[in-house]
Amino acid sequence: MTIRRRTGLTLVGIACALFVVLIFLLPLLLNADRYRTKLVSYLEGKTGKKVEIGRLAVTFSPGLAIQVNDFGVKSPPLFPPSYIVKVARIDAQLDVRSLLHRQVVIKSLVLEQPTINLVSDPDGPWNFENPGPQNTPSTFPFGVVSRVEIRRGHVTLSNLLPSDAAGPVFFEAHDISSELENVNVDAIADPASTTLDGEGTLKAGLLRFGSIEAKNLISSIRLQARQVLFTDVKAETDGGNATGELSIKLSGKNASFKTDARMKGIDVAHLLMAFPGARGKMTGKMEGELKIAGEIEHSRHPLEGLHGSGHLTVRNGDVPSLRLNANLMKLAHYNDLGPAKNDPSSFNFVSTDLELDRERITSKVIDIDGYGVDLDGSGTVSLSGSDELNYQGVAEIVSQQGFVTNLIARLAGGTLKDSKLSFPFHIGGTIDSPVFAKGSKGKKVN
């Protein structure tokens, strides 16, 4: 057989294949939107949820694709009226070879401006979970999509309250761009899935978890066994930056999360602005490490059950309501406050460990270098709204007082050594109204 003849047969074969594809697609190409109702019915049967499609079209650049405009999937009746997902436009690129066998295989998906709203019911299920197919054929399973791209997306997660009323949003991400590989669309909606359902990269202009905000976030992301895992996270937050990992688990009656974060250059005053009860309570620049985890409860305060540990340092700040330097000097009966006169509440350096357990912070080793006063201590503070303080330790004051003042201070319980007066102290009351005393009990400082 000559080369020319083989070439001719090859061209004829290709032409025949294209003809078969054309016959299969011709009705769709002439008016794709006429199949919109059938596609909606199919998707509703497959997902068990109400589906909306504004318009269907076929495009040829950069490849053969179905374009879906104004796509929406509504939450099931168990949930308040809402959408699970709304997408302005979806471009689904098809595998032409599979069409020869009358099979529809999606090679890639591009989602323009998707809004994803995930809601958990107190009894356990999420609004996106698939209750199971309802007598629909399995000739077109979504399966694994090789590539999924998200452009300008938004995601929110929230819980319903025990009354089934809408609860607060505990996680949200805005201006999302993401590229994912090998996304198992069927498994994501399957509550029994244990597979790796996709992985890739993610960028977000703004991410908020509880009251904590991060901007210009970049991370790797993995969807696996009902979990979303963010790794190699880098973000800007409160004038500084943060790195670490975050995972959110969506299985079980309550969702749960775990984070391991490292922070540097955080503006404490800006950070506390997110917490109404803590605004204006402290300033300074903070750095440190935190590991926090917990269940996300179906309540108006879904993150109140958190627990964790870490170590923080804050430099060049103050705690206005405590007036720590001045109050401790008065407690020692010092009339000349020295540097504390001009900086009654300021400090050079604070270093502390911490353990968080249901809105109470416990610190075993606290080191504070103030102006004229240094102290070592330990104690607890409540974050539940009472702001209750319970701290104790030993304060050390550089002694530049006269003989009589030093004598009175020593008689009051202090110890003078190397021109430094040290004495035990206790701080009770609240952050706004602290009560200073010697030891565990003593005279209140006015």
Where are these regions (language model features)?
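Short, structured interface segments
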Residues: 126-128
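Gram-negative outer-membrane assembly/targeting C-terminal domains
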Residues: 431-446
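N-terminal Sec-pathway targeting helices
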Residues: 2-17
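Intrinsic-disorder/low-complexity linker and hinge segments
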Residues: 130-141
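Small-residue helix/turn framework positions
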Residues: 63-86, 105-123, 146-161, 167-184, ...
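Terminal hydrophobic membrane-targeting helix
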Residues: 19-121
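Short, surface-exposed linear segments at secondary-structure transitions and domain or protein termini
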Residues: 92-98, 222-226, 434
